[in-house]
Amino acid sequence: DMDAEDTRKAIRAAEAAWPEWRARPAKERAGVLRRWFDLVMQHQEDLACLMTAEQGKPLAEARGEVAYGASFIEWFAEEAKRAYGDVIPGHGRDKRIVVIKQPIGVVAAITPWNFPVAMITRKVAPALAAGCPVVVKPAEDTPLCALALAVLAEEAGVPPGILNIVTCSKDRAPQVGEELTTSPAVRKVSFTGSTPVGKLLMRQASGTVKKVSLELGGNAPFIVFDDADLDAAVTGLMASKYRNTGQTCVCANRIYVQSGVYDEFVEKLKTAVGKLVVGAGLEGETHQGPLINQAALDKVRRHIADATERGAKVVMGGQAHALGGTFFEPTILTDVTQDMLVASEETFGPVAPLFRFETEEQAITMANDSEFGLAAYFYSNDIRRIWHVAEALETGMIGINDGIISTEAAPFGGVKESGLGREGSRHGLDEFMELKYLCLGGMR
């Protein structure tokens, strides 16, 4: 249970280790990252079992997350060698202009519990590839996955001080977070978590004008038009909505279905949800595990109660599961309207609220009626509609006829109050680098 002083020690260790790491050729850093990737994949089963025991997601999902998390290490091992600058035509006959990229410095990474491996590697891998040391504060609920990753990183050859893990209790999290965001030695803060906490960290970081990346809350719309393949839409919704018990920032939270296919879609969804197996994550047939804690369970109950009081109907689930603890039944709500909490707040649970809409423009208006703008999904077979809706939705990412969109090769991030910056892809490396402009005179 570390505190502010322990955090300062970790920052000092990162500061001291930085010069040697940044001086290494990119190819050497890439080699270390590649060895880390290999070790993570060699220990995929061990890491998955640890994750399931610590966080609760089904073992099959945990295995998938380990592979997904490792993909960022592999990707940025390759991108480390591609931190290209620019040569720009000079503004005078004797002028030459060059732009180079340099590592920004000590990075603070604050990560969530819902993806305790992937959210760390998605930040640490590009930072290390760029030549930066990192201090990671993992979520209080899932410190063990972070420590396991650090052990493997050390075995891969990451030098002492380059990857530092600061674990703490919920009581000490505010002081650790404040130290990371206010220390002049930290030049970059990367945070994944709730929008209110992101705003707090942003305010704290402003005192030293740090570069900040924020991947915050989402309340993703999932739109089903009347020309869609309904079976494909149900499959996509199941993958997006109930994965990780609905505890993902990009999961479908507001399902908008066009009136002409609404009833048929509800019946198809009920059939699919009825096949979900709720249970302990280490049991082989489990599709849905428990919610992370009692507060999460209480929020799900509150959202369902609010919806039913305002006229929504529970057509499946709606209760705590017979298994007890924080298990909850996969739930479907119909006749949901925009004035309910499920429309304005991120539920973060296994609840699928179905809204009805009439026209394309109405669907766009309803989908954009949110302070969040992380992800969106829609199903249609009309190419004109696909382009129009994709351009009109106010989100950073859109799944078109697809319910799973995350990949290391594409930029992950949102707009509006869902965050700043992008993770993954070739753009992810730039988040940990500074541009430096060199003007050479007297070149004639």
Predicted ranges, named:
Residues 1-2, 186, 223, 277, ...:
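Conserved C-terminal structural/oligomerization subdomain of aldehyde/semialdehyde dehydrogenase
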Residues 16-23, 38-45, 56, 78, ...:
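Generic secondary-structure signature for well-ordered alpha-helical cores
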Residues 196-337, 366, 400:
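ALDH superfamily catalytic-core signature
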Residues 85-232, 357:
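Rossmann-like NAD(P) dinucleotide-binding subdomain of oxidoreductase/dehydrogenase enzymes
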